[in-house]
Amino acid sequence: FGGASSAAAIYIRGIGQKDFVPTVDPGVGIYLDGVYVARSVGAIFDLVEIEQVEILRGPQGTLFGRNTIGGAMSITSKKPDEELMGNVQMTLGSDSRVDIKSMVNVPFSENFMGRFSLAQLSRDGYVERSFDGLDLGNDDTMTGRAAFRWIASDAVDVDMAIGFTEDDENGPAIELLGI
């Protein structure tokens, strides 16, 4: 990853896209639970529950379709299960960084269960803009996800999920140098 803000810059075998351009499709396909993420903006996810990440290098058009000339990145999130459990994780750091991530897994019945996650990530800016004192590079992100699994029969499982991310930031700190 190397993009600014929430735009991913993913390269596989030298093929990728650094900056967001609305008219250009990225050369590396990103898939979240099998769903294609069509643009690089918003492709940096603040996922709390990741089960697996697969990196498939080289052209993947046969399996994944267009926009995978460089390869594909497949992210699989954890599914709800039969166990009642939960956890909370907190990270503290410099520049007033506070990250809080939480998850709870609830079996509602023998064949219906849910998994809920919520994360709040915040950090103050690391560069002060000289003319107005605004901190640049600050980040305040909230993300959440609710996933449900219905085991209809021995042969049929139905998985449903919905998620959101809200990102409030002043943008990256960029300094122009006079030459």
Kindly label every feature range from the protein language model.
Residues 1-35:
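Extracytoplasmic beta-strand/coil segments of soluble accessory domains associated
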